[in-house]
C-alpha cells in the first residue's frame, strides 16, 4: 500500500521537504530521550556546549563589550537567563552569575548535560539509520549545508548575537 502522503510530498518544494525531515529527526530524538526536553531546550543545551569553546567565548565577550546595554537588551538578557535556569533546574548546566570574563553570566555543562548531549547524538545517528541516509545523501547534505551556512552566519554576525 502506498504511503497516504506520497503524492503530497512529491509536490512539495525543497523548503517543505527540509522541514519534514528536521521535524522527523527532532520527534524521534524527543520521543526516545531519557529526559523530557522541549526542542528549544535541546537547541539551547547545544549552544551552551558551543559557547564553552574558547573562540566562541571570545566572540561573545567582544560582542557584549560593544553592545548598547539599553532596556531592550536587559529584557533579552533576562529572558535568556530564565531559559538557561530551566536547564540548570534539570541539572544539565551550571550558571555563573558573576563570571570573571566580563559577561553578565556564563553557563557550563554538567556531567549530566554532557551525557544528554551524547544521548541526543546517538539518537540522531539511530534516526539516520531508520530513515536510510546513505553516504551519497550525506555528501549532498554537506554541500547544501555549506552553501546555506553563510546566510545564518552573516545574520548572527550582523546582529551581534551574544546570548
Where are the regions a protein language model picked out?
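N-terminal leader segment of winged-helix/HTH proteins
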Residues: 1-39, 90-92
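N-terminal helix-turn-helix DNA-binding core of bacterial DNA-binding proteins
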Residues: 27-79
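Alpha-helical hairpin
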Residues: 36-37, 109, 133-137
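Terminal interaction helix/tail motif
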Residues: 118-163
Amino acid at each position: 500500500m502506498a504511503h497516504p502522503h506520497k503524492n503530497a510530498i512529491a509536490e512539495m518544494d525543497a523548503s517543505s521537504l527540509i522541514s519534514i525531515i528536521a521535524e522527523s529527526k527532532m520527534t524521534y530524538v524527543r520521543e526516545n530521550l531519557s529526559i523530557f526536553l522541549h526542542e528549544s531546550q535541546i537547541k539551547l543545551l547545544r549552544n551552551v556546549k558551543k559557547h564553552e569553546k574558547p573562540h566562541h567565548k571570545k566572540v561573545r565577550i567582544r560582542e557584549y563589550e560593544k553592545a548598547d546595554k539599553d532596556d531592550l537588551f536587559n529584557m533579552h538578557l533576562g529572558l535568556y537567563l530564565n531559559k538557561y535556569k530551566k536547564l540548570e533546574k534539570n541539572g544539565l548546566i551550571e550558571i555563573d552569575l558573576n563570571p570573571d570574563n566580563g559577561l553578565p553570566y556564563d553557563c557550563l555543562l554538567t556531567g549530566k548535560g554532557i551525557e544528554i548531549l551524547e544521548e541526543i547524538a546517538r539518537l540522531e545517528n539511530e534516526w539516520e539509520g531508520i530513515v536510510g541516509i546513505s553516504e551519497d545523501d550525506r555528501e549532498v547534505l554537506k554541500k547544501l549545508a555549506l552553501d546555506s551556512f553563510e546566510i545564518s552566519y552573516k545574520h548572527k554576525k550582523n546582529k551581534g548575537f551574544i546570548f
